[in-house]
Amino acid sequence: MQSILWFALIASVVFLVLVDLASGLNGLETLSSGADVDELTTATRLLRAAHLDRKLSEERAFISGESIGSWWTKVTEWLRVKFELIIAYIKQLRVKSNDVKDDAATNDAAHAKDDAAANKAARAKDDASRATYEAARANYEAARAYDDATRAQDVAALEAARAIEATDIAAYTGANAEYEQSMFLNGFVKTIDLHNEKNAPIMTRLNKSLDEAKKSSTFREIADGVNESKVALVVHEKQDGYLLWILHLKWAVEAKSPKDVVERILKDLGTHDVPHLQERAEQVKKAYTIFLLYVERMSRATHPK
């Protein structure tokens, strides 16, 4: 039991010595780091001053040989000073801890303020960018609408030009067709004139029949005249395709409608060896149609209503 008490006493003394050294080192560190003496608490300064005064008094007494109190008084005084130093050190640590907390809170507030300012600036920048984008998009929409309107106008103008062109082409085609028909009929008349000498008997009979038909009360006599010359067609078939016109004139007289005549004539062209007429089938068709109209006109002139 006694050994335990001695061990506890020695441990306490060692602990107090270590604390004293730590507090002394902490004070030196504080002073060496440039910290202000005012940062220490008033109690700490008073305790350190009393401790130094006591040390100086002990040293003077030791030098002069004087004794200050008994041994037990010195020990209790030393312990009291150590405990007061410990309490002052703990208070100092608490003050530093509070200062650290205050600094942390201040830093957090400053960071929060900076973050809020940065977020506000970034949001303002985003709003400005969005406004710029919306303006650019509006300009694009306006430009596209203008392009669509311009394209619609161009299409309308193109359609109008095409309509005018189609009208011009139709007029040209009609005029050209009339010109071709006129030229073909002129050629047909010239062909008749050229063959008048070779086919004089046939033409004489045909012209005679036409003259008689103009004087008679019926147009059917033309068919009789052509029928009488049918023998001459067979005889002169190899000379020229012109002889077919005389036969077709007979068909035109006997037919009920120009359509029937055209179909019969085109069918007959396929059974005869007439190369120059087969190569110009379309022109022949037009010429026959005009020729049939000519025959109908003759019929109306001969038999007025």
UniProtKB/Swiss-Prot annotation:
Coiled coil: none
Region (W motif): 247-269
Subcellular location: Secreted; Host cell membrane
One term under GO cellular component: host cell plasma membrane
Secretion signal, residue range per the UniProt entry: 1-24
Keyword line: Glycoprotein, Host cell membrane, Host membrane, Membrane, Secreted, Signal, Virulence
Glycosylation positions in this chain: 207, 227
Domain of life: Eukaryota
Family: Belongs to the RxLR effector family.
Functional description taken from the UniProt entry: Secreted effector that confers enhanced plant susceptibility during both compatible and incompatible interactions between the pathogen and its host. Promotes the sexual reproduction of the pathogen in the plant host.
Name of the featured protein: RxLR effector protein 17
Source species: Hyaloperonospora arabidopsidis (strain Emoy2)
This protein's encoding gene: RxL17
